[in-house]
Amino acid sequence: MTMETPLVYLSRLDEDRFGVRTAKCGRLGSEGIPQVMAFCRKHQVELLIARCPTIWLTAAQELERQGFLLMDTLIYFSRDIRAARIPRVRPGITVRGYRPGDEDGIGRIAGDCFHDYLGHYHADSRLDREKCDEVYTDWALRSCLSRDPADGVLVACVGDDIAGFGTMHMNDSTQGEGLLFGVSPSFRGQGVYRAIMIHCLNWCAERGLEEMTISTQVTNLVSQKTWIRLGFEPVSSCYTFHRWFT
């Protein structure tokens, strides 16, 4: 891990939302388990959220032996921006950058899309369901109002209506990452998500980035099919575990 991304850290955002002291670990292998567990004991952590690459099966099995519960599996895709021409968006859908005032529509779409979402928060029966829903609405709104953690917010419109959104982040000088996406139930099946993804690729190209990466739940086949049709390929996957200490 880099100095900017410690192996394990306290998540004030999750603690404020759920009312339990929470720590996160983005990449946990066998050798890091003692350090992470010691950190949690020292800081009186109640909930640890840890990700483990699926290729580290021995580590995943050790986590299970130590009381960690599997909550979800993420699959990551990547596309070389330079490898092939970026397709054009079909007529009838406009994708533009975020404008002040868009946040109300974006927040509503996030609320609709992520109600009872099959992610690691909702998979944990000890976490309040409504507060789990709020994770994604709050994420979308923060991306608009404070650009945290997003570097860009793209908004899809059909006529005067906001039909969907996508958020982008620059991981470094060569790679962009798609973070959070949503399409209004009223506009699904009309190519809105595809249009947003195409503009995300253009967003990367305009900034001279070489690659775009994106991830989702392994069960989210609809999104994965869209990515594959746009030239993305699967590159890695990881488990998300929760470990309660109370």
Model-derived segments and spans:
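Conserved beta-strand-loop-alpha-helix junction that forms the acyl-donor binding cleft
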Residues: 50-58, 185, 214-224, 242-245
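Conserved acetyl-CoA-binding loop-helix of GNAT-fold acetyltransferases
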Residues: 30-38, 180-185, 189-206, 225, ...
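Conserved active-site alpha-helix within GNAT-family acetyltransferase domains
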Residues: 55-70, 190, 194, 206, ...
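A conserved beta-strand-loop-helix scaffold within acyl/acetyltransferase catalytic domains
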Residues: 119-176, 180-183
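A conserved beta-turn-beta hairpin within the catalytic core of GNAT-like acetyltransferases
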Residues: 7-25, 71-74, 150, 170-179, ...
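Conserved GNAT acetyl-CoA-binding A-motif
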Residues: 43-53, 175, 204-216
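Short amphipathic alpha-helix that is part of the acyltransferase structural core
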Residues: 20-27, 89-134
